[in-house]
Amino acid sequence: MLQPPKVLLLYAHPESQDSVANRVLLQPVQQLEHVTVHDLYAHYPDFFIDIHHEQQLLRDHQVIVFQHPLYTYSCPALLKEWLDRVLARGFANGVGGHALTGKYWRSVITTGEQEGTYRIGGYNRYPMEDILRPFELTAAMCHMHWINPMIIYWARRQKPETLASHAQAYVQWLQSPLTRGL
């Protein structure tokens, strides 16, 4: 039987202790041997990112998952800093920047709003695909394959059984990420 590809799960939540949805998603994932869960806020509370360490983690994994809440139509500040510093020219893009070529990017995002608010004419004015376009473009700039994101809408108001169902789907995808959800 083929081994699943190595997955780096970059988790970025500044108030992780208060996020029931993210705890439910992460708990079963921690049991998967081929998945490295890397909590950016736990590792870098001062925002001083060890760029070389992070780049080595990226080199060592084939699938990169970015799990975070949607903050102001983007990601939390530390993840933005991580993206700007770690995905540097000469490493992930630009001349000689091919370290991530052929790897896979998937965003796993929790939101505080219902799905229907992310549409033209809705409260958030744009569909989620448009809001996530900068992440998709970043993946393309790094020569990575974009996998459709997993979005948990209205995360803090979901019933426990609904969150458990999302967690189960997440684990199933992580067990064979290159054959599901491409």
Swiss-Prot record:
<dbReference type="GO" id="GO:0009055">
    <property type="term" value="F:electron transfer activity"/>
</dbReference>
<keyword id="KW-0520">NAD</keyword>
<dbReference type="InterPro" id="IPR023947">
    <property type="entry name" value="K_H_efflux_KefG"/>
</dbReference>
<dbReference type="InterPro" id="IPR046980">
    <property type="entry name" value="KefG/KefF"/>
</dbReference>
<dbReference type="GO" id="GO:0005886">
    <property type="term" value="C:plasma membrane"/>
</dbReference>
<keyword id="KW-0472">Membrane</keyword>
<dbReference type="GO" id="GO:0006813">
    <property type="term" value="P:potassium ion transport"/>
</dbReference>
<protein>
    <recommendedName>
        <fullName>Glutathione-regulated potassium-efflux system ancillary protein KefG</fullName>
        <ecNumber>1.6.5.2</ecNumber>
    </recommendedName>
</protein>
<keyword id="KW-0560">Oxidoreductase</keyword>
<dbReference type="GO" id="GO:1901381">
    <property type="term" value="P:positive regulation of potassium ion transmembrane transport"/>
</dbReference>
<comment type="function">
    <text>Regulatory subunit of a potassium efflux system that confers protection against electrophiles. Required for full activity of KefB.</text>
</comment>
<dbReference type="GO" id="GO:0008753">
    <property type="term" value="F:NADPH dehydrogenase (quinone) activity"/>
</dbReference>
<dbReference type="GO" id="GO:0010181">
    <property type="term" value="F:FMN binding"/>
</dbReference>
<dbReference type="Pfam" id="PF02525">
    <property type="entry name" value="Flavodoxin_2"/>
</dbReference>
<comment type="subunit">
    <text>Interacts with KefB.</text>
</comment>
<comment type="similarity">
    <text>Belongs to the NAD(P)H dehydrogenase (quinone) family. KefG subfamily.</text>
</comment>
<dbReference type="InterPro" id="IPR003680">
    <property type="entry name" value="Flavodoxin_fold"/>
</dbReference>
<dbReference type="InterPro" id="IPR029039">
    <property type="entry name" value="Flavoprotein-like_sf"/>
</dbReference>
<keyword id="KW-1003">Cell membrane</keyword>
<keyword id="KW-0997">Cell inner membrane</keyword>
<dbReference type="GO" id="GO:0050136">
    <property type="term" value="F:NADH:ubiquinone reductase (non-electrogenic) activity"/>
</dbReference>
